[in-house]
């Protein structure tokens, strides 16, 4: 397994009341089962559902924004990405992000650190939002997008390309308000399949055509949001990559079943048509 981290089992806490409108509360899956749903195994199999759906799927969380320093190998990989040919796409900030970066650095235990130093001090990729607008980002290992192209965009616009994401976009105002409230802590997880073995799935790194299942990887992201105060919020992403052949038969069957229920639009958005054909779904 190529892994930044294991998704933390037991990181969630029961879903008590959030002070948000009920329509948004329903989208947050406030019932207790949502907690179990996102406390995933080391390869994130609890994220895989049949049928596949696109939603907000936020759960209250006790997970840390960062599990701490990366390994030396991972830090070197991040540094190489930030200073490589695609670096300008991966790390940047708006001119008004200074106060938020100060709060984020203090929250992570690195007061005074700049954005790159913060990113290199954490296992996770990092982002900073103010009232739901992206103000800074340091994503060494993005999933199919150019991170700095999203700077200055609000939550709904950032997620505009997401196929079948109407519920997510409609809830964007409530999500932005909730993540900015004092003490707010949320988590969610997402998964996909890829033929690109690198942690970075930047669109400048084209995915190889896949001809055998052994060339596939199951990729998961564990995402955490913490309110930082003054309407700022920190956002982190930990990535896990597991080779298809290292999954159990039951896990491969579940992934295939979920993929079989994805809409054509979602398959296109995730670049999964060729993989679906290989899996005969």
Predicted regions and their residues:
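Extended, well-ordered protein cores
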Residues: 4-16, 20-281
């Amino acid at each position: 397994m190529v892994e930044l981290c294991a998704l933390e089992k037991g990181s969630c806490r029961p879903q008590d009341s959030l002070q948000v409108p009920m329509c948004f509360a329903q989208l947050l899956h406030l019932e207790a089962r949502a907690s179990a749903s996102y406390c995933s195994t080391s390869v994130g199999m609890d994220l895989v559902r049949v049928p596949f759906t696109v939603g907000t799927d936020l759960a209250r969380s006790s997970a840390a924004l960062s599990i701490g320093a990366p390994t030396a190998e991972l830090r070197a990989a991040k540094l190489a990405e930030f200073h490589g040919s695609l670096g300008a796409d991966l790390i940047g900030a708006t001119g008004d992000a200074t106060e938020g970066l100060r709060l984020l650095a203090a929250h992570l235990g690195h007061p005074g650190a700049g954005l790159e130093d913060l990113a290199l001090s954490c296992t996770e990729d990092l982002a900073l939002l103010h009232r739901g607008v992206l103000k800074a980002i340091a994503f060494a290992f993005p999933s199919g997008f150019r991170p700095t192209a999203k700077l200055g965009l609000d939550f709904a616009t950032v997620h505009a390309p997401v196929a079948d994401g109407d519920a997510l976009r409609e809830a964007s105002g409530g999500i932005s308000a909730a993540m900015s409230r004092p003490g707010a802590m949320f988590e969610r997880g997402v998964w996909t399949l890829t033929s690109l073995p690198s942690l970075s799935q930047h669109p400048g790194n084209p995915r190889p055509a896949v001809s055998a299942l052994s060339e596939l990887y199951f990729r998961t992201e564990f995402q955490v949001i913490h309110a930082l105060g003054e309407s700022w919020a920190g956002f982190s992403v930990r990535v896990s990559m597991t080779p298809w052949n290292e999954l159990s038969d039951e896990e491969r069957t579940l992934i295939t079943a979920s993929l079989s229920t994805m809409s054509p639009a979602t398959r296109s958005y995730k670049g999964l048509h060729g993989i679906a054909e290989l899996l005969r779904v």
